[in-house]
Amino acid sequence: MRLVRSTLGIFLLLIQIAGTSPASLAARAAACPKPAPAKSQSRDSFTELTQDKGYRFDRRGWIYVHLEGSPHDIGYQHGYLLAPEIADAFQSFRLEATHNSGRDWEFFRRAAREMLWPKIDPEYQAELQGIVDGLQANKTKLDLDDIVALNAFQELPDYYVPWLNSQTQTSKVSHEEIHGHCSAFIATGSWTKDHQIVMAHSNWTSYMDGERWNIIFDIVPQSGNRMVMDGFPGVIASDDDYGVTSGGLMITETTIAYFHGWDPTGKAEFVRARKAMQYANSIDDYVKIMLEGNNGGYANDWLIGDRKTGEIARFEDGLKHAKVWRTKDGYFSGSNFPSDPDVIRDETAYNPNDPSSGPNARKIRWDQLLNGNKGNIDTTLAEVFLADHFDTFTKREGANRRTLCGHGDASDTVPGAKPFDPVGAVSGKVMNSKMAAALDFIARTGHPCGINFDAAKFLTDHPEYSWQSPVLHDMDAGPWTEFRSGEHVAQPAQ
């Protein structure tokens, strides 16, 4: 286990960042946030809660959950071990989905039951039913419709509802507000310090969701690959997504901004993503599984690495169009910008020529950081990149929705975004090929920069978001901590 670096260490690493003048380096030193203190030992658990072959323990702001067995067994362990967290996450999602869509909860239950459930593979139907059974065994009264809708918490409100509104001529919600999520890169070959694949990702979402997106799943299914991934309580896919498999794949993504499209006859994205992580043993396998029954939900640019070959890929998965770029010597970055001209033209309202947009500003910053550090990129630098607060549009240091470490609550002028919206980077994860071989990665809860979010102060300053007060909590930044498959609870120091 590894804790957060010192402020001096962060500053010395920043000096390596290319394209930065001495004057701006001085400004960076002043602006560099002090790392959040390590989570109190009282937040770590020294005993494990078990259920059959499954177990859980708390560490540094994360909940580590091991699941093993048949599909129903895995689901049952998941539901039983995480019952309090699933009930809490469900309340948050229900409030967010109904408030933002103007639809009641029964609308989402019906969509889950009638549109999504019939197309879910039997294996995952059994796992979802297992979650419900485990919840109910642990005195949590959620049913199958609730859990299927929760698993589709990205795609039903943000893709299906806008599509349905467009079919009925109802006003649509801004695509930027719903789809501007995540920053990530993957690099290989001469670009990295040891010619290993290096992959990093920060999850961007509402702080309501992000404060709860703190599960490390270690899943040993009856068939397919073992998987270690971050995740959300009650959801069978990683969903932000970040994971590594015994099949040799390193997997992450960022959403395609301004995307519009939905196929009600297709298979839910959370099912396809989980299946691809579990069964793909190559980049080609992954692409094939994701394209089968594509419903357009949660359309992403996937960044995939095969540690067995050193090859990396960018897989842009639209509904009408899909394209794959591959290399064994280079990098791909993601910040919600589509790259395929066909996807841009036919499936989005994205403007690639607007430097003030969040996706484009972050794309420029990725290019600066990755090009400027060719040959030196490793997991240590990746942590620093994810914490970056340089706005390429204003040419100033200052966290907002245009910076790699996003802080929507500090933003009032980014086009297409609601002022001071409590959304942004809510976790960071990094790994390299050597770590991937051990099913191992390093993760941090909260903002990758180390700044904590104070919910009470925010709601006092911005009462327009008071509707979130029942579920909006503080979001503390934990230390960078290493997790691997098969971990057990740490013992207290003697």
Locate predicted features.
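Positively charged n-region of N-terminal signal peptides that target proteins for export
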Residues: 1-6
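Bacterial N-terminal signal peptides
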Residues: 7-19
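N-terminal mature-domain region immediately after signal-peptide cleavage
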Residues: 25-284, 291-297, 303-326, 355-494
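Extended amphipathic alpha-helical segments with heptad-repeat/coiled-coil character used for oligomerization
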Residues: 311-353
